[in-house]
Amino acid sequence: MVNLKIVIVIIVLISSNVVLAKENSRSLKVAAQEENEFTEINSAPLKVSEAARYSFADIVEPLIPAVVNISTIEYVNSKSENAEKDPLQEKVNDFLEKLNIPLNLEEVDQTPKSVPLGSGFIIEPNGLIVTNYHVIANVDKINIKLADNTELSAKLIGNDTKTDLALLKIDSEEPLPFVEFGDSNDARVGDWVIAIGNPFGNLGGTVTSGIISSKGRDIDIDTDNIVDNFIQTDAAINNGNSGGPMFNLDQKVIGVNTAIFSPLGTNIGIGFAIPSNTAKPIIERLKKDGKVSRGRLGVTIQDLTEDISEGLGLKNTRGVLVAKVQEDGPGDKAGIKTGDIIIEFADIPVKNTKKLRVIIADAPIDQEVKVKILRDKKELELPIKITSDNEEVTKDSTEETNKKEITNKEENNLSITKNNITFGNLTEELRQKYTIPQDKMGIVITNIDEEESSFKIGDLITNINQKSIDDISKLEELYENAKKSDKKNILLLIERGSSNMFVPLQVM
């Protein structure tokens, strides 16, 4: 009986093991199947070169020789406070002074000092170099140091302030290593990029890498700049990298490193480059003509803010406001007037002043385009023949400032005060004091009792709510009418130096 029980237990155990074995076998098959499926999903080949998986060395090695350091020479008087002290020269000077031999410090030889400016890159074996305009702006002498430490003088072939690009030329007996532009339109957010340059002026040939963080960035680095499609990267870019190249993994230049965003002045992972597709045509025009000609409308413009729109009785901020029309310019000849709102240019909707400047710059010179404006809340279409900006440059009214600082207050003049701002009638005394031409009419700001204001003493107000004004009583009337109508502000057209701009005055 005992033996029978043992046999039964053995059979049960064997059966259990068989079942477990089958389950384990099935589980293993499922796991294997799932593993195979998982492996297949993740075994798709990545579109990255084998070399770049582990190192960029093979990519950057042939590129570094084409990247240059740019510097200039300043002459420092050896006796100036900022000059480095030469102990031997000081001893000689002390000896001469003891002998009562006068020293003419102005005749002491000046010591040449190399001042780093930025980076650049060679685009042709004959020595053509691309860099940023701001790197070489206001510099008389430009020096180039190659990767092998050879130093050569460079001459400026041409520059374009509106895109911050410049073309230099060095002469060399031997063909120079060079790099080529690629297609920045093919670049995608997340692509690897490599920056090579001369950070802080003394670290030439520095290579950094990162990815494209974004494309089409519109940043306000300069009011004149019309580039509105910067490439953003987290590759380390610092002071001194300006003008250097941004490469893709195909060793092509897809950007010109131009700016960084940093409250500290050093890299925090936000850098910007001019796309190669923007730079290439500019460089070609600089090679050919040494300059870039663009379209000109001949008007001063400013953005429409909510306060300005409210002052004009508009319900939105579509378009840009014409603050001044240049006499005999294309806009003047076509009939554009101060106070008009440009809403379309060549069938392209106008969003803001920078967009309009870009559109005008790209407009065909000496050809007619259609411009749609809003005047007295009615749409009009005007044909305008665009001219070259080499004749005169169009600027945003907010770019210019009153160069003449006036701090004294005006007293004993018929005046009224609104919002801590004193307005006075334009007397002959005020004309002379604030240098206002005889043919100008309006009222003038004589005092401001607040620290921050969009107005300045000496501003001439010629228009309020698009109505001409020549007496402060009109200001009082329009201000009180707006107050009764529960309007937030009235709109003043001011003249400041050679510029015009609309500025809202809050109704309180």
Curated annotation (Swiss-Prot):
InterPro entries: PDZ, PDZ_sf, Pept_S1C_Do, Peptidase_S1_PA, Peptidase_S1C
SMART domains: PDZ
EC class (word): hydrolase
Compartment(s) where it occurs, according to its Swiss-Prot or TrEMBL record: Periplasm
Catalytic activity: Acts on substrates that are at least partially unfolded. The cleavage site P1 residue is normally between a pair of hydrophobic residues, such as Val-|-Val
Function summary: Might be efficient in the degradation of transiently denatured and unfolded proteins which accumulate in the periplasm following stress conditions.
Protein name: Probable periplasmic serine endoprotease DegP-like
Organism of derivation: Rickettsia conorii (strain ATCC VR-613 / Malish 7)
